A protein has these predicted regions:
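Interface amphipathic segments
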Residues: 1-195, 207, 214, 218-325, ...
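Short, solvent-exposed loop/turn segments enriched in Ser/Thr/Gly
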Residues: 332-333
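Short helix-loop boundary/capping segments
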Residues: 347-367
Length: 496
């Protein structure tokens, strides 16, 4: 037949079937192209299109299909490129050896395609029951097992989802499952387990889920994050919406100085909006807070984070930076605003301020070089301990480039342990302010603090041939003048 147009019932289920060219014999073979099937009530049909349908017609009806697509009206997920076997016996339609791709129907896909093989489906008594194991295609890793039940009469159904110890590593990353993770999470390592459920009627779809990790590591824009643990509850799993105030423990985070044992509060809202309610960590006898912020997942936009330092102890800070020959006393508060965009990350207007009544900076190690000279050694011993009444530290610049650090130290006097003499006693009567500007790459800046005070951290310039054994600079070697060329240069004079 050149074409086919049928309507009726498959068991108790209304069915409308149309196709292009069809060839069949009874008993015998069936071959059909471009088959369009609508199952269920006319106002909310479940549609199936099949590019190729073949089979054997007799006591049992069976065959193969390929190039099929399936769409449940109430569920915003579509099956494409489906193939497998079919069998109709005793009023029961069975599909087996099913392979397909699962796509998000939303225009801006929330989920990347998943694939299945060896899926199965039965239609009996007007009810569909299906089982499929869904995999991420590039890694072939199982993401979830789905068990589906659907009543064609009521257009109601549900899908139970099981995620069993899903491993994220160099083969599978969050952004290979959803584009919303791009620019938010990278280099993920860890396992996630949980369950989800999707329920639908002819009018609405609801979906929920709970997913847990015991240890999840990843790289974020503001630094590496290790040991994330906890459970996240979704109130709209398909829409990636969570219940308010989801909390995760964070073993450590390193925005430049590593901090430990924190907790993050957040929620995911409709349209891919991540709301960070805040996070906090113990920080060198004080606290480090991530202030509330909002960002659109999957969008190329400027993102701002602010780290707030409360009651940071200067002595602990020096230890964190491994300044083995430096000691400090004082308490600091401040904020470090971080901005991330397509040009990278930077600090804008970072400021740390010492609390009253001030503090102390002191050098507690031996001099790096023993031959600095009598006056230099005398001055160093006199100023090796400084008390201050006020200190501010300003920070600006690119996180992957140069950071400008401005130190302003007010009310400077000699501290305990410094040698006093006539000069220092006269200086002590004067109001002194130190203004120090440091310009260096951010990561190198942290190392520079240590190299200033730890003689084992940098190489001796005498070993590099920059100074002699007495500390005097070594003159640069004299470069001899070039020898006359072996070949006479051309003579360009005019000759008669």
């Amino acid at each position: 037949a050149p074409a086919l147009a049928l309507s009726g019932r498959l068991g108790d289920t209304p069915i409308v079937l149309r196709s292009a060219a069809v060839g069949f014999a009874w008993p015998g073979s069936l071959a059909a192209r471009n088959v369009d099937v609508a199952l269920g009530q006319p106002d909310a049909p479940n549609r199936f299109t099949i590019a190729s349908l073949t089979g054997q017609l007799g006591t049992n009806l069976s065959g193969q299909f390929s190039g099929a697509e399936a769409r449940l009206d109430a569920v915003p997920l579509d099956l494409v490129d489906a193939s497998g076997t079919w069998n109709y016996t005793g009023g029961i339609l069975s599909l087996g050896e099913g392979a397909f791709r699962l796509l998000d129907r939303v225009a801006d896909d929330r989920f990347r395609p998943l694939v299945a093989r060896d899926a199965s489906l039965t239609l009996a008594d007007n009810r569909i029951a299906a089982l499929a194991v869904l995999r991420e295609p590039s890694s072939d890793r199982i993401v979830t097992e789905a068990k589906i039940a659907h009543d064609l009469d009521s257009a109601r159904g549900h899908a139970d989802l099981l995620v069993a110890d899903l491993l994220f590593d160099d083969r599978l990353q969050p952004d290979t499952l959803t584009y919303l993770a791009l620019g938010v999470i990278a280099n993920a390592e860890g396992r996630v387990s949980g369950t989800g459920r999707i329920d639908w009627t002819g009018d609405a779809v609801t979906s929920t889920g709970r997913f847990t990790t015991d240890k999840f590591n990843f790289a974020a824009a503001f630094g590496p994050v290790d040991g994330v643990s906890g459970t996240v509850e979704f109130t709209d799993l398909l829409g990636l919406v969570t219940a308010p105030d989801q909390r995760l423990k964070i073993a450590s985070i390193n925005p430049g100085i590593e901090v430990y044992d924190g907790e993050l509060s957040f929620q995911l809202e409709p349209d891919g909006l991540l709301v960070v309610n805040g996070a906090e960590w113990p920080f060198i006898d004080g606290e480090l807070h991530l202030l509330p912020t909002r960002m659109k997942l999957g969008a190329a936009e400027q993102r701002r984070f602010t780290l707030k330092v409360v009651g940071a102890d200067a002595a602990q800070f020096v230890q964190q930076l491994e300044m083995s020959n430096m000691a400090a006393r004082g308490v600091f508060d401040g904020e470090l605003p971080l901005v991330f965009d397509e040009d990278g990350g930077r600090i804008e207007g970072g400021l740390l301020t010492a609390r009253a009544p001030g503090g102390n900076l002191s050098y507690i190690g031996a001099l790096t070089y023993k031959d600095m000279g009598a006056m230099a050694n005398f001055a160093f011993q006199s100023l090796r301990s400084l008390d201050f009444k006020g200190m501010t530290i300003g920070l600006d610049g690119e996180l992957d480039g140069e950071i400008f650090t401005r130190l302003r130290i007010d009310g400077v006097t000699q501290g305990e342990g410094a040698k006093r003499n006539f000069v220092t006693r006269q200086v002590a009567r004067l109001p002194i302010r130190f203004n120090i500007n440091i310009r260096a790459p951010f990561q190198r800046l942290l190392h520079s603090f240590r190299s200033l005070y730890d003689p084992t951290y940098v190489r001796d310039p005498r070993d590099l041939g920059l100074v002699d054994s007495n500390g005097r600079p070594i003159a640069a070697p004299t470069i001899p003048a070039p020898l006359p060329p072996d070949i006479q240069p051309p003579d360009s004079r005019k000759v008669p």
